[in-house]
Every structure is written in C-alpha cells, then in structure tokens.
Amino acid sequence: MKKIRKGDSVVLLTGRDKGKQGIVTAVLENKLVIEGVNIYKKSVKPNPAAGVTGGIIDKTMPVHISNVALVDGNGKPSRVGIKLVDGKKQRFLKTTGATLSA
C-alpha cells in the first residue's frame, strides 16, 4: 500500500520549492507530480503533424517521494503509518492519529 496517493495534500520538505504545498496529480514509481510545484521551462520543437506549436512551455516535473510529507489538519507536515482495521489496511497520520480515506 502506497503511503501517498493521488489527491493527497502534501508539502515539499527539500529543494528550491521547500515549504510549498500542493495536491498530488500523479504517482509514478517513487516520484510524485504535484500541482504548482517544481515547475521548469522546457523548449518544444514545432510539430505540425501533431498540431504542436514550438516555443517555451512550463512543465511540472516529478519530485521524489522522500522529499514530501502529507499535510495534517493543522497545516503541518506529518508522516503516514499503516494499521489494520477489521482486516483491512488503513492509512493514518502519525502526528494527530487521524485516519485517512482509503
């Protein structure tokens, strides 16, 4: 069971965007794509066959999962634990003990 999932609110712990909060939009192997965080400029060549115009675009790049933490109800970073509830795994916040939706 992954500790961080799509739709979770997270905060960046390291890097140039340290302290920024955002919503997870995609989960890759060990990386997350977070809305509004880790944005880089990429140059794109024009491709008329695909209908792509060339130029410089802003692209959201993935962040390693170890560099983020979930945000609890107080807006502070929290680690995530997993416990068994009625034979099913349930995620919970270690700072407050609150359970997260499946």
From Swiss-Prot:
Q: Which GO terms describe its molecular function?
A: rRNA binding; structural constituent of ribosome
Keyword rRNA-binding part of the UniProt annotation: yes
Q: Which InterPro entries does the record match to this protein?
A: KOW, Rib_uL2_dom2, Ribosomal_uL24, Ribosomal_uL24_KOW, Translation_prot_SH3-like_sf
Keywords on record: Ribonucleoprotein, Ribosomal protein, RNA-binding, rRNA-binding
Please give the biological process terms from Gene Ontology that the record holds. Answer: translation
* SMART domains according to UniProt: KOW
Pfam families registered for this protein in UniProt:
KOW, ribosomal_L24
Q: Does the keyword Ligase apply?
A: no
GO CC annotation: ribonucleoprotein complex; ribosome
Superkingdom is: Bacteria
Task: Provide the function of this protein.
Answer: One of two assembly initiator proteins, it binds directly to the 5'-end of the 23S rRNA, where it nucleates assembly of the 50S subunit. One of the proteins that surrounds the polypeptide exit tunnel on the outside of the subunit.
**Subunit structure comment from the entry:** Part of the 50S ribosomal subunit.
Q: Which family does it belong to?
A: Belongs to the universal ribosomal protein uL24 family.
What is the protein name given in its UniProt record?
A: Large ribosomal subunit protein uL24
Q: Which gene encodes it?
A: rplX
